[in-house]
Curated annotation (Swiss-Prot):
Superkingdom in the source lineage: Eukaryota
Family: Belongs to the paxM FAD-dependent monooxygenase family.
Biotechnology: Notoamides have been shown to exhibit antitumoral activities. Notoamides A-C show moderate cytotoxicity against HeLa and L1210 cells with IC(50) values in the range of 22-52 mg/ml, but the IC(50) value of notoamide D is greater than 100 mg/ml. Moreover, notoamide C induces G2/M-cell cycle arrest at a concentration of 6.3 mg/ml.
Chain positions recorded as FAD binding sites: E45, R117, D314, A327
Annotated protein name in UniProt: FAD-dependent monooxygenase notI
Gene: notI
Natural source organism: Aspergillus sp. (strain MF297-2)
The UniProt record lists the keyword Oxidoreductase: yes
Amino acid sequence: MAIDGSGVATPAPSGITVIIVGLGPTGLAAAIECHRRGHKVICFEKNPKSYRLGDLISVTGNAVRVLQEWGNGSVIKELQAFQCNLDTLEVYNETGDLKLSAPYNATQAKDEYMLRRSRLLDIFLQHLKSLGVEIHLGIQVADYWETESSAGVTVGGEKIVGDCVVVADGVHSKGRPQVSGEPFALEATDGIAFRAFFNASEISQDPEASWILRDAGEKDCFKTFYGKGLVMMVGTAENHEYVFWSCGHKENVMAHPSSVATVLDLIRDWPVSTRLAPLISKTPGDNCLNQTLYTRPPLKKWVSSNGRMIVLGDAAHPFLPHAGQGANQGIEDGAVLALCLEITSKKDVPLALRVTEKLRYQRVAAIQQRGVEARDQSLNVDWGNGGFSKKLTLHPAWLHDHDCIKQVYEEFDKAADAVTKGHEHTFGGIPVG
């Protein structure tokens, strides 16, 4: 490998061209990891810019193991610079009584970074651009295709040719049916989420709304309010430069044209709404997003018939937000694929994609189930009977301590055996017992 001016090793070309559709966390991670492994990367994203609505996102230890290799550690340093500066995580009931206060030291958190979703995407995208990768923003892919020796996409009537295609276009994936052969089917859960993020200047001059800034002091704060069938989170980010809130409801409610009005209606019977409502009502109209929560049974297969197209991230395995792993598992997906392609080389790209599926399938299915359990816990809090009906381990080792790169090296041959000979195997990264 050669060393570039920044001191980062430049990978030797593998001869493999990877086309990536979708530049959310999964697509960005796949693009960066594929470049790190020496593959040529061509990216397409339908949105013209990287900004996304949303709230906070946590990058956990299992994903940090991948990110720490990017840019000779520069990407991790950026995450550290923009993470929430928290001392405690506070839990309240619907009357506003503090029920739990857990210490949280952002500088000593175990390989975990909590930050704005849009900031995370921008950090990833800027790093990808710095690598000189071919990126096309604001471009809609019209079609996907493959032969025995190549795969590609059709854009503006032109066929773009590669060795494989990664479909990472999210939960409402347009490419998933063509790759998996399964119909576009999502199951709406019994819930809806509202998310908002806006500049703190929107509330700073309102004494009834700016209490969250006073509570944060010189740092940030994160407060969660639990009621029957409803959970509300509010807080600040980037040293209270930004305010966020999110609301999860057990039922699929009919949203008003303004999602803010819907949330105000949901919490109107909470005694603590006298504090929350002034803050929520200050949300700029275009800064609130309402989302029906979706999941779906695991796809029967992630890889196309000829083995040259694969769905990854939410396109393959959407998680409920309660799992706290959507972006993290997408990052793992991208890293595993890139390494599998490096191991097989250009001569056996289909094997690399199928091994990726084998190594990832059991793990993400287990995490999907954990998300369902976490949802049930958070939306069924009964403070009169002890609060949470079931205690979930906050940072289980099988989830947060998993090393997806190490797993590839240790289990590639076993996964290849499962692919080529049809043998059944259990792979790492799942709960034991």
